[in-house]
């Protein structure tokens, strides 16, 4: 069924006149018209669902540009630890216990949370990624997926699984990238291989990059260069590349990222929680680097609340540089929409524009924490939270509305998650 969103305050993020009052007509999953008033014929009205949006804000659906959806099941399992101890002593061993079925339900849990936050697309790196793909297709959310790659006895198996993902799941809803985990878990030879394969399969790459001081120091000890320079040397930046974190990057690194069109994904909460410091986002943007926003996983955040991430992202840079005028609200909002779509080389989402996919979030404008409203974009960035999300729409399909998930049985999911929790409590330390 087609949709007509009537009387909304519309944030288009599409150049001039980015905030307007009007209607959005959605036909066959695409935005067919945005104007002050759209009148439908009687015949057309019967085939169109009308949403009264007089007290709603319509804006592009949020894109979570870095997470590990299958890891949601490890929320609160390993907290208050530095990155390497958290990863190698707790997370990696626990992940050995995660079956395909567990990753499927974990992915459903993560997707349910993201839909309630207004997320319409997420970028993901994990294992059993076919299960995350299955969950995404069943629920209607869009995704850019990568099977995490490492150098060990299963290296070739992981590469083969990536190829299978590309063959089996590439579609309008799902893109598949190659996903070398990091320079400290992948050999240089594997990084080179990934660059070759991504060229062969005409796809992109996502990687954790310069997340911690330990990573950078180890890279210098082993290769006598920074992680950024190593990735450039290996050829990763010849392909569309999404680099999560980029916390410890110097001016030369930033110049390399900018010159090669690499997207840096800002994950402020995860960086703070793991004690990894503050990404120089202002310097990255000033130098011409495309910057998006991600939550990272629920095991390191500990939520997938993109609205919270947008809020923290806007505030941290102002405090770090002691410059309240930097990273204005509109710029941060674009990081979670326009910039993220650009990162994955997707050109039909991230804005509300005629011909674009109808990936839309509706926010309640009359909730107490959203009043008064002198600046709509500022209220989204600095005031909103998931309780304000009225509807999440992907390709014109309503996936979440007025407190209800429409493509997920929430009660059944909760039952499954609690059952898995009991199993994992007995099998992981």
Swiss-Prot record:
Bound cofactor: record note: Binds 1 zinc ion per subunit.
Pfam families for the chain: Amidohydro_1
Listed EC numbers: 3.5.4.28, 3.5.4.31
Record-linked SUPFAM superfamilies: Composite domain of metallo-dependent hydrolases, Metallo-dependent hydrolases
Keywords assigned by UniProt, alphabetized: Hydrolase, Metal-binding, Zinc
Catalytic activity: S-adenosyl-L-homocysteine + H2O + H(+) = S-inosyl-L-homocysteine + NH4(+); S-methyl-5'-thioadenosine + H2O + H(+) = S-methyl-5'-thioinosine + NH4(+)
Keyword Metal-binding annotated: yes
Essential cofactor(s): Zn(2+)
CDD domains xrefs: ATZ_TRZ_like
Entry function: Catalyzes the deamination of 5-methylthioadenosine and S-adenosyl-L-homocysteine into 5-methylthioinosine and S-inosyl-L-homocysteine, respectively. Is also able to deaminate adenosine.
Protein name in UniProt: 5-methylthioadenosine/S-adenosylhomocysteine deaminase
């Amino acid at each position: 069924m087609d949709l007509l969103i009537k009387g909304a305050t519309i944030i288009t993020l599409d150049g001039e006149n980015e905030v307007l009052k009007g209607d959005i007509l959605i036909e066959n999953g695409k935005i067919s018209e945005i104007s002050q008033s759209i009148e439908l014929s009687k015949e057309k009205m019967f085939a169109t669902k009308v949403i009264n949006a007089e007290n709603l804000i319509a804006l592009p659906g949020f894109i979570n540009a870095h997470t590990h959806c299958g890891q949601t099941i490890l929320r609160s399992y390993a907290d208050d630890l530095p990155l390497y101890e958290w990863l190698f002593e707790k997370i990696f061993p626990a992940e050995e216990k995660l079956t395909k079925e567990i990753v499927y339900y974990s992915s459903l849990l993560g997707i349910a949370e993201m839909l309630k936050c207004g997320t319409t697309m997420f970028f993901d790196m994990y294992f059993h990624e076919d299960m995350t793909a299955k969950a995404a297709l069943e629920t209607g959310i869009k995704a850019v997926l990568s099977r995490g790659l490492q150098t060990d006895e299963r290296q070739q198996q992981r590469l083969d699984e990536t190829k299978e993902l590309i063959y089996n799941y590439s579609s309008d809803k799902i893109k598949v990238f190659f996903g070398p985990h990091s320079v400290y878990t992948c050999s240089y030879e594997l990084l080179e291989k990934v660059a070759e394969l991504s060229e062969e399969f005409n796809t992109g790459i996502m990687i954790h990059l310069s997340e911690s001081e330990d990573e950078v120091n180890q890279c210098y000890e082993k290769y006598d260069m920074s992680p950024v320079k190593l990735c450039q040397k290996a050829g990763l930046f010849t392909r569309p590349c999404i680099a999560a974190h980029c916390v410890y990057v110097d001016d030369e690194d930033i110049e390399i990222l900018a010159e090669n069109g690499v997207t840096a994904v800002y994950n402020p909460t995860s960086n703070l929680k793991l004690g990894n410091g503050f990404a120089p986002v202002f310097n990255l943007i000033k130098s011409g680097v495309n910057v998006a926003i991600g939550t990272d996983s629920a095991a390191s955040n500990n939520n997938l609340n993109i609205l919270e991430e947008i809020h923290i992202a806007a505030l941290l840079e102002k405090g770090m540089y002691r410059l309240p005028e930097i990273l204005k609200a509109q710029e941060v909002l674009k990081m979670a929409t326009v910039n993220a779509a650009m990162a994955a080389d997707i050109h039909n989402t991230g804005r509300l524009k005629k011909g674009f996919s109808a990936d839309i979030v509706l926010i309640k404008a009359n909730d107490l924490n959203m009043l008064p409203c002198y600046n709509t974009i500022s209220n989204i960035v600095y005031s909103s939270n998931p309780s304000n999300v009225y509807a999440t729409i992907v390709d014109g399909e309503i996936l979440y509305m007025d407190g209800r998930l429409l493509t997920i049985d929430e009660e059944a999911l909760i039952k499954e998650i609690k059952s898995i929790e009991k199993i994992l409590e007995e099998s992981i330390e």
